A protein has these predicted regions:
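C-terminal motif of bacterial Sec signal peptides marking the signal peptidase cleavage site
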Residues: 22-23
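Contiguous interface-forming segments/domains that mediate binding rather than catalysis
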Residues: 26-217
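Bacterial N-terminal signal peptides that target proteins for export
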Residues: 2-13
Length: 217
């Protein structure tokens, strides 16, 4: 006796339509970006936020990159300029030590006309008397920008000394400055995304007035 077919022609047609619909489904905006980020270990430090970050990037794409990935920390330039560099590095301590960095002895030396950080007793200028004159003259805000650039440079020197692949990049929303830690591979992925906004791409801050390294196009 022959066994009856387990699937009727109608059922087979329905299954075929479902499969065809699935294969033609429109990918989410961030699918390709998410795949590249996964390959470059973007979520390595995200901890319990990793799945939420993945979902947001898949749904929104590039704009969702700057969430709670464990790579982003506040870095207000004005706070840094007012003697906040040592506290800033201390805030980054868990991340830096995770990269193998040995934090040196740091001490703020904030004076009326200058600010330096003593790194194991050696003076690292954050802003000088001449910088203050520029601040009070035609370049308001320059001490904050210089403090950020020189603080980031200090952090990157520590990372380089520890042989870490991560580097401190600045991200600026127009209202606040933050530091975002990225590898060369990750910054390349971010720059190559077709919907990337050039002036919001993370950048290495410089001491060059007036944009201090921030892309403008």
């Amino acid at each position: 006796m022959k066994l009856r077919s387990l699937a009727s022609p109608r059922m087979m047609l329905a299954l075929g339509l479902v499969a065809a619909t699935a294969s033609c489904a429109t990918p989410a905006p961030g699918d390709a970006l998410l795949s590249q980020l996964e390959a470059k270990q973007f979520f390595k430090y995200a901890g319990p936020n990793a799945d939420r970050m993945r979902a947001e990037i898949r749904e929104k794409g590039w704009p969702a990159l700057f969430g709670d990935s464990g790579r982003v920390f506040g870095a207000d330039g004005l706070t840094l300029a007012k003697g906040g560099v040592t506290k800033f590095v201390e805030k980054l301590r868990p991340f830096l030590e995770g990269q193998g960095v040995k934090i040196p002895e740091l001490k703020d030396d904030l004076r009326q006309e200058s600010y330096s950080v003593l790194v194991e007793g050696a003076s690292l200028p954050i802003w000088t008397k001449d910088d203050l004159a520029r601040e009070l003259g035609a370049q308001p805000g320059i001490t904050g920008a210089l403090a950020a650039a020189r603080s980031f440079a200090l952090v990157n020197k520590l990372l380089e000394g520890a042989k870490s692949q991560e580097r401190a990049y600045a991200i600026y929303s127009g209202a606040a400055l933050s530091v975002m830690f990225l590898t060369d591979d990750l910054i390349a992925v971010m720059k190559a995304d077709p919907v990337a906004v050039p002036k919001f791409i993370p950048y290495r801050p410089t001491t060059d007035f007036p944009f201090f390294g921030q892309p403008q196009q």
